[in-house]
Amino acid sequence: MNNTVRTAARSDDGNHDKFLTFCLGQEEYGLPILAVREIIGLIDVTPLPQTPAYVKGVINLRGKIIPVIELRSKFGLPTVAYTAETCILVVEVAGEEEGSASFQLGIIVDSVREVLDISRSNIEPPPNFGTSIPMSAIQGMGKVKDKVVILLNINSVGAKQGLEKISGDAEAGSGTPARQLQQAA
């Protein structure tokens, strides 16, 4: 498997990209639709000791161990109680090192909205101020009708965490994931 993850689906005319949108509080975010593998309801997450607060643990999804992060915590947003709309987006993230394989990552979000087709001419660079989100995590700002959608760079959101080291086959038993995550940090 190569280390690149296609980041956006292009429309037939090649001038639009498709994004799955979701909410964290009142803010709407978007991820390139081709990076999203599936959307699942909130299921039990097995916690990992001695990991950052935003790393909620791992899930076993059809025999595959998938690390799960809470995007609210990662972005420094206040925590809220989970609701019936809270779900996990399973996304494909490029490996951090050149030549390393991509891996799947679960992202807990407040709710999923819709798939938007955004014209590239309506995507602007992110502002350089006033956000708790690292600038490398923002791909751009999508203008859609009367709102702005924060478009995330999933490879940056999921990178620099060592999470690919704890992703894998549940039956392979890849050692102690918490220790691997600590060593990668």
Describe these PLM feature segments.
Residues M1-A185:
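An acidic, low-aromatic, low-complexity terminal/linker signal
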